[in-house]
Amino acid sequence: MLGKLDTWLTEHPKRKDLHGWRRFIVEFWFFGLKEARACLFAGLFFIAMFLVPKTGWLGISRYDLLLIFAVSIQAAMLYFKLETWDEVKSITLFHLVGFALEWFKTSGDIQSWSYPDEAYTKIGGVPLFAGFMYAAVGSYIIQAWRLFDLKIKSHPPYWLGTLCALAIYINFFTHHYIGDYRWYLVAFALGLYARTTVLYTPYDTTRKMPLLLAFVLIGFFIWLAENLGTLFGVWRYPNQIGAWASVHISKWSSWALLVMMTFTIVANLKHIKHTISVSKD
C-alpha cells in the first residue's frame, strides 16, 4: 500500500496547464503529503509517545513500551522495503550517537535533562528508546531524499563537512568544561554551506532553496516536537520539574546543528552520493 502511495506521490507527468495560484496550491498540497510520508517513523513514534499512558500498560512501563514500538516500526519499514539495510545501518549509527549524547547529558555531573519514569530498559538513567528520537531524524532525511528526489549543488568537500559534523558533536560534550563554541561552529557552517543549494521536487517541477535554510526549518520543527515531549512528561529539563515551561529557544540552534550532523552521515550513503555535486572551488 505504501509502495503505491509513494508511486502516486513521486511519479507525475509535466502539467503545463497549472499556473499561478492553482500551481501553488497543488505543489503545496503535495509538499505537505510528502513531508508527512517522510515523517512516517518520527510521526508514529511521537504519536505513541503521546498516547502511551504514563503508568504504562499491562504492567509494562511507558519507556519499555516505547522501545518495543520503535523497534517494531523499524522492523516493519525494513520488511516492507521502505528502508534498505544500508539505510538501517546509518539509522543504527544515529541511535548510537544519540544514545551516547543522552547518557552524557543525563549523567550525575551534568543533568541537562532527565527521564523521570522507571523502566527495565534504562541504562545509566537513559531509556533505550531515547536513541530512536535521533534515529527518527535520520529516517526523515533518508525518506525525504527519495520522495522529493533531492539533489545537492555546490556541496563542500566531504572531509570539510565531516570535520564540521565532528566538531559539532564534540562541542555538545566539551562545552560543559571548556566553553561553548556553538556560535563559532555556526559561523564556520555558514561559510561552509553558504553556496550549497538543495533541489527538490514537490510535484512535477524542481524547486530550490539554500541548504542552510533547510537545516534551520527542520531544527525548528524538532524544537516544537521537543516541547510536546516535555509537556507529556516523557523527559524534562530542570526548569520543568515544578511545572511545565517551554523549552528554551536556544535549543533550536542545537537541533539545527544536530540536523546538519545527521545530514552529513546521510550524504555518505552510497546511493545518495551520486545526487550530490561537490564544489570544485
Predicted regions and their residues:
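Aromatic-rich, lipid-facing transmembrane alpha helices and their immediate juxtamembrane interface loops
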Residues: 1-281
